[in-house]
């Protein structure tokens, strides 16, 4: 059972698996409203949580696909405990990262020492080959080899002297400690500690669910459910002057075909609004869909296009 947190009339889904299940199995897309963990200072691409329209949340609750719960409020009495737990986890993470950084630096140092040793051996072998090539250069080559061996011996002696001193300097084995400014902080995309949440009844009006019983919500929901049962995907259409955008399939694959406007059967539609909505829909290559539920439960649809703009 998927969980949807509701607070002040906003229904949020926090789990990535739940978002995927809603889109693939139930045809409910919602819209992401959260900042990306790696790009918190931009809003061109958003991430979790997923915000559901009230009609989407109610539909999912009615068919038993999700459980609506009231989002837990922070308790000031537990604030100090939560802060202590957070600091402890941060310190444990710092110690773990410090150990991993020291291990990585030590591995790199060993790799460099191996390369230095290989280079010294190759240089010595080259000098030995050059010394046996001609007897006329034997004296000079042997003298150069002695000088190189002397310098290499001095360098290795210095390294041997530096080795014990660095190992005795501290537990870091000569590796600089990781500064706290380099600490990687994990940005949680879900609640790290479980909390108790009480179920929310969408049939009863409350602070978290103020939509129950409102005529506008009941009108929109009846039309939303009818279109959803016909296999359409729906999303909000505020910027297109409608109630819903109607897609023939997943919005990631299709453009919207209709701009749905919800009207009660007894409502009168001003001619100016009707013309404006028709012109707007045609200009964005969509058809205006006038939707009105009937007393028998059926929904009547009327499509409208502005022919002069086609």
Swiss-Prot record:
SUPFAM superfamilies: tRNA-intron endonuclease catalytic domain-like. Residues 128-144 have a biased composition (Low complexity). It catalyses: pretRNA = a 3'-half-tRNA molecule with a 5'-OH end + a 5'-half-tRNA molecule with a 2',3'-cyclic phosphate end + an intron with a 2',3'-cyclic phosphate and a 5'-hydroxyl terminus. Its EC number is 4.6.1.16. It is found in: Nucleus; Nucleus, Nucleolus. The active site is at 247, 255, 286. Residues 119-177 are annotated as: Disordered. The keyword Signal does not apply. Pfam families: tRNA_int_endo. Keywords: Disease variant, Lyase, mRNA processing, Neurodegeneration, Nucleus, Pontocerebellar hypoplasia, tRNA processing. The keyword tRNA processing applies. InterPro entries: tRNA_endonuc-like_dom_sf (IPR011856), tRNA_intron_Endo_cat-like_sf (IPR036167), tRNA_intron_Endonuc_cat-like (IPR006677), tRNA_splic (IPR006676), tRNA_splic_SEN34 (IPR016690). GO terms for cellular component: nucleolus; nucleoplasm; tRNA-intron endonuclease complex. Constitutes one of the two catalytic subunit of the tRNA-splicing endonuclease complex, a complex responsible for identification and cleavage of the splice sites in pre-tRNA. It cleaves pre-tRNA at the 5'- and 3'-splice sites to release the intron. The products are an intron and two tRNA half-molecules bearing 2',3'-cyclic phosphate and 5'-OH termini. There are no conserved sequences at the splice sites, but the intron is invariably located at the same site in the gene, placing the splice sites an invariant distance from the constant structural features of the tRNA body. Belongs to the tRNA-intron endonuclease family. Belongs to the leukocyte receptor cluster (LRC) present on 19q13.4. tRNA splicing endonuclease is a heterotetramer composed of TSEN2, TSEN15, TSEN34/LENG5 and TSEN54. tRNA splicing endonuclease complex also contains proteins of the pre-mRNA 3'-end processing machinery such as CLP1, CPSF1, CPSF4 and CSTF2. This is tRNA-splicing endonuclease subunit Sen34. It comes from Homo sapiens (Human). The gene is TSEN34.
């Amino acid at each position: 059972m998927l969980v949807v947190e509701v607070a002040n009339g906003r229904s949020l889904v926090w789990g990535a698996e739940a978002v995927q299940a809603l889109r693939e199995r139930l045809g409910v897309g919602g819209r992401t409203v959260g900042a990306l963990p790696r790009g918190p200072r931009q809003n061109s691409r958003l991430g979790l949580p997923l915000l559901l329209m009230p009609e989407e949340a109610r539909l999912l609750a009615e068919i038993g696909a999700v459980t609506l719960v009231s989002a837990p409020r922070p308790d000031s009495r537990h604030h100090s405990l939560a802060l202590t737990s957070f600091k402890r986890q941060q310190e444990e993470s710092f110690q773990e990262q410090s150990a991993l950084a020291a291990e990585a630096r030590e591995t790199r140092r060993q790799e460099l020492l191996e390369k230095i040793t290989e280079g010294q051996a190759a240089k010595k072998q080259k000098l030995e080959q050059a010394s046996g090539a001609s007897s006329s250069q034997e004296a000079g080559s042997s003298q150069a080899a002695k000088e190189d061996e002397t310098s290499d011996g001095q360098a290795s002696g210095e390294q041997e002297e530096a080795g014990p001193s660095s190992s005795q300097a501290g537990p870091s084995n000569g590796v600089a400690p990781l500064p706290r400014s380099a600490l990687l902080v994990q940005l949680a995309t879900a609640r790290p500690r479980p909390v108790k949440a009480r179920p929310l009844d969408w049939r009863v009006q409350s602070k978290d669910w103020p939509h129950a019983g409102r005529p506008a919500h009941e009108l929109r929901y009846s039309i939303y459910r009818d279109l959803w049962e016909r296999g359409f995907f729906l999303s909000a259409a505020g910027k297109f002057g409608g109630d819903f955008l109607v897609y023939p399939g997943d919005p990631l694959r299709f453009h919207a075909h209709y701009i749905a406007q919800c009207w009660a059967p007894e409502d009168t539609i001003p001619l100016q609004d009707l013309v404006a909505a028709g012109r707007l829909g045609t200009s964005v290559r969509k058809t205006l869909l006038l939707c009105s539920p009937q007393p028998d439960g059926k929904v009547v649809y009327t499509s409208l296009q502005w022919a002069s703009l086609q």
